[in-house]
Amino acid sequence: MAGAPRGRGGGGGGGGAGESGGAERAAGPGGRRGLRACDEEFACPELEALFRGYTLRLEQAATLKALAVLSLLAGALALAELLGAPGPAPGLAKGSHPVHCVLFLALLVVTNVRSLQVPQLQQVGQLALLFSLTFALLCCPFALGGPAGAHAGAAAVPATADQGVWQLLLVTFVSYALLPVRSLLAIGFGLVVAASHLLVTATLVPAKRPRLWRTLGANALLFLGVNVYGIFVRILAERAQRKAFLQARNCIEDRLRLEDENEKQERLLMSLLPRNVAMEMKEDFLKPPERIFHKIYIQRHDNVSILFADIVGFTGLASQCTAQELVKLLNELFGKFDELATENHCRRIKILGDCYYCVSGLTQPKTDHAHCCVEMGLDMIDTITSVAEATEVDLNMRVGLHTGRVLCGVLGLRKWQYDVWSNDVTLANVMEAAGLPGKVHITKTTLACLNGDYEVEPGHGHERNSFLKTHNIETFFIVPSHRRKIFPGLILSDIKPAKRMKFKTVCYLLVQLMHCRKMFKAEIPFSNVMTCEDDDKRRALRTASEKLRNRSSFSTNVVQTTPGTRVNRYIGRLLEARQMELEMADLNFFTLKYKQAERERKYHQLQDEYFTSAVVLALILAALFGLVYLLIIPQSVAVLLLLVFCICFLVACVLYLHITRVQCFPGCLTIQIRTVLCIFIVVLIYSVAQGCVVGCLPWSWSSSPNGSLVVLSSGGRDPVLPVPPCESAPHALLCGLVGTLPLAIFLRVSSLPKMILLAVLTTSYILVLELSGYTKAMGAGAISGRSFEPIMAILLFSCTLALHARQVDVKLRLDYLWAAQAEEERDDMEKVKLDNKRILFNLLPAHVAQHFLMSNPRNMDLYYQSYSQVGVMFASIPNFNDFYIELDGNNMGVECLRLLNEIIADFDELMDKDFYKDLEKIKTIGSTYMAAVGLAPTAGTKAKKCISSHLSTLADFAIEMFDVLDEINYQSYNDFVLRVGINVGPVVAGVIGARRPQYDIWGNTVNVASRMDSTGVQGRIQVTEEVHRLLRRGSYRFVCRGKVSVKGKGEMLTYFLEGRTDGNGSQTRSLNSERKMYPFGRAGLQTRLAAGHPPVPPAAGLPVGAGPGALQGSGLAPGPPGQHLPPGASGKEA
């Protein structure tokens, strides 16, 4: 990012913020981007303009203070001139002070306009500097009041070398410290003023030539001291402010980046769950309420239509696919179905293998929900027909519809998936299974909702399905009047004979699908949730404008542009809405302390990077005082000793600060130590300057009875002496004024102790003048320019330093407040990001969620992964159907699902143990729990080595599930039984579905694992021969069941996993020390794996695929849950 300020070598060749030129990173925690504040302005003009806008109101306040001081200065001199006080020859300044006073007041009025912008303020500063220059030049000792020398009775006396020096020193310091002009301009002003006074003094002021060079040298040293201090104060104050601005900008940039990430996470979350459910679950997930039972997130909808659809012929097609081809093919097909669902106002619920089911009227109640589902079914059939005609692959769609009541929501604690339950859902599933390819199969209930808008024919579903026959359900087929939709690019007649392709493999099919993108515009999963859509942008900008009215909030959404430009635009809007009054409300008006004690404490803990430099500069000033003292002021042993002590002490302070910086900085240099050191250093330097003053004042003078001053002599005569005996008294007084300047360089010392110290120093200065008799000696008791000027000078200097101290304190505190608020909001956003990530990791596997969060949506590809060895488990509760019933007394089945939620939640809580960290819950299908192990990304050799360990973990988890279910049975007086099937082998994992992305695994391994469950025995764990081979060398006990007929696989040899055995051969549930050992013995209840098993029926006699809870996938994964079915219903038939 070209935001680094220009260095002395001219580093101005940077582009806009966010580009590569001049980019620098701050060495802060987390590698935040920083822009190094080196010199006066940033290389990036946009960033410099932002900084000027950021400092506008503070600079405006400083300009008002500067103009107030200049007006007071000119007004005081004009008042002294008006009263006709005798003084030095007025020269060209005669009559100019009132004019300058009016000019400064006029600029003060103009500056006080609230709508003043940066260019106008800069012009005001330049005009103020110009008027200050003319004021300073006219204060030089031109001596045009008459001939050189004294005039008897004249009002003017000869000009002196010290004439106008204090005015020029004050104006120079004001130009550096308070005026909003460029540093080079302020430096030029200081040099011109100093050079002009020295030149005029050298040429026009009469003086003894041998002493002139000493006077000019003393003046030059005083001008040098003020210029050095002014430059230091200006540069360090601006550096501190620029650093705070950059810190705030970096925090805002991080905050916006985190906001983008959070927006991705929120959109990802909203794509997986309905908003109302997601928000409620998120709140409870982050702040779990105290409750005995787990909260259930179920809603009831009484008037919806449910559609189940299955792709006929897809199993054989998919069996030939590679991992990439399979995921692409599924995403293409189901992505198109998601688009059709959106167009037809349906919400897709789940994808189970090649089965797709959705509901209309769920999230948004619709009176024509039946029409929407019928249109959806017909569109799906047309889509598959178009694919079949274009590719010459035998594919078709079987669709079943029913209208009724559903319970929708989420069960469990991990891997939430939105689902629906009810007897009507079961019936819709049966309608699909009993339908015919290419037909939309509907019930009489659905037909009644269509109001005769569609032609129908008898469906005779009872002839193909026993459930329909048992429950005497009449069914119908929708008869489309004509080919409803023509999808360009996929109709066979549109393909030229010369280019018609005969597909022999799936690869050719996929190539053709890619060529036919006019129909298939399926999005990459999650790609549509990674960027803001137009509506969201407009809504975000409206929200931003509202939030910008409140300064304390940085929350907004900004249109995505270049990162640096976006941050700069955002800060620009914040500055437009910035209100100093609101920010000052956080500070105490008098002490400027934060009203929040904790914030004040943190502010005082900030490191003062320039404290050592301030002490070095104080040492330089002490050395300058020493030179002035040696040049022009009469020496005394006491002052010399004080000067030596001051310099030695300051050198020791510099060494101490260097040591503390190396060893323990900033812990050793607390705010209390810095304040004490600052006060002592200022008092010490001022004491040196005041020692010069004391040595030059006429302490032997006393008042005569008539008010004149006399010197007491041994002769008794009382001659009146009109002048003090020390010719260097004016320069000593000037040293006293400049001696207060060290207060200005300790920037991070609070203004309150500075102002108290200024009051003490000013009082002591005035007391020395009065007690020494200096004022009476100079003016003989009357108001005189000579006698009044030192008091006027010290008052104006003290006023300027007090205003500057307060201004710097306000600047630093508001800068810190700005940066602290930005940092707090960034930290809050970081916390939100972590919270959202926790939720996302609860919806998707951690490595999958991280993949989508880290991916660039423009370069995102389909996520898929092929695994050679993965353990897959299906655990079902087959007798849950006997328990599920819909009655008014149980809220139409909600209370039954509440118990199922407890069971699934307890299963989920098992995965919180470190022992099961490698397990991944895939989903729940009704009362069936699906999990896998070995999906975490690992190297191939490592995966082969640890597959036995993974299977051992999966087997232990299955065993402990029996323990958990038995405990629930004991507490709820139920008799649920678990039936588990486990298989191991290659699988394909991926994310499909553009609108409702879903992570799943596919493959023959998954199908066989499902069959191990559906063909298993209640209370037993059935495993394949491969699982037995990998685990038999461990401490597991198996019983060979024999060969079992498995759909699509023929006869398979299977085993029952009986449990684990210890070294003595006795049977236990697990060797894991973390296992929770339930006290079943108190009720005489044993774990089912430890108790006697029910007799196993002969393998040949098992009704494969029949019975409650049977899961029979259609080639890729289990079909929709048989648990939806009421007693006696069968599962989904492919």
From Swiss-Prot:
Extracellular side of membrane: 697-726
UniProt lists the family membership as follows: Belongs to the adenylyl cyclase class-4/guanylyl cyclase family.
Positions of glycan attachment: N706
Residues that the record marks as modified (Phosphoserine) are S553
- Name under which the protein is recorded: Adenylate cyclase type 1
The entry summarizes how activity is regulated as: Activated by G(s) G alpha protein GNAS. Inhibited by G(i) G alpha protein GNAI1. Is further activated by the complex formed by GNB1 and GNG2. Activated by calcium/calmodulin. Inhibited by the ATP analogs adenosine, 2'-deoxyadenosine and 2'-deoxy-3'-AMP.
Query: Which keywords does this chain's UniProt record carry?
Result: ATP-binding, Biological rhythms, Calmodulin-binding, cAMP biosynthesis, Cell membrane, Cytoplasm, Glycoprotein, Lyase, Magnesium, Manganese, Membrane, Metal-binding, Nucleotide-binding, Phosphoprotein, Repeat, Transmembrane, Transmembrane helix
Query: Where are the annotated coiled coils located?
Result: none
Which GO molecular function terms does the record list?
Answer: adenylate cyclase activity; ATP binding; calcium- and calmodulin-responsive adenylate cyclase activity; calmodulin binding; metal ion binding
Region of interest (Interaction with calmodulin), residue spans: 495-522, 1027-1050
Reported EC number(s) for this entry are 4.6.1.1
Per UniProt, the cofactor note for this protein states: Binds 2 magnesium ions per subunit. Is also active with manganese (in vitro).
Superkingdom, taxonomy of origin: Eukaryota
Q: Which residues bind Mg(2+) 1?
A: D310, D354
The scientific name of the source species is Bos taurus
Q: Give the membrane topology.
A: Multi-pass membrane protein
